[in-house]
């Protein structure tokens, strides 16, 4: 179930490139331009097949979420719905966009609300999420290549004082 835990972030932009092979914007872009709001639904590996169905080249007006047997539900802070099965949703308001031709745009949005499924929250008060448990993946290039976030590493950021003390600057 998508979260009872909801917390605000310092506004950060989300970007999406939205091409359509038939020389027009995809419905997603058209809807963003019309409503000036959108939900970015992050996808775990268990949702890969459903996510792939939502990328079908359906004609305008077809609800791809329904085709994929996904459930929509009201968003917390925007009018467009979110995907109930998504472990993380960023509810966004349009800041600006760049159009490159008649079917491709980069959309920049301000995150109004971030919603995370309870099972993936380590510390709600501090906004700490169990990222490995999300098992996220994303599109890379072409129409069929994806990457996972299963290989992770942590690095401690150096401080200026530390570098000065070590004679590096």
What are these regions (language model features)?
Residues 1-169:
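Basic, polyanion-binding surface patches
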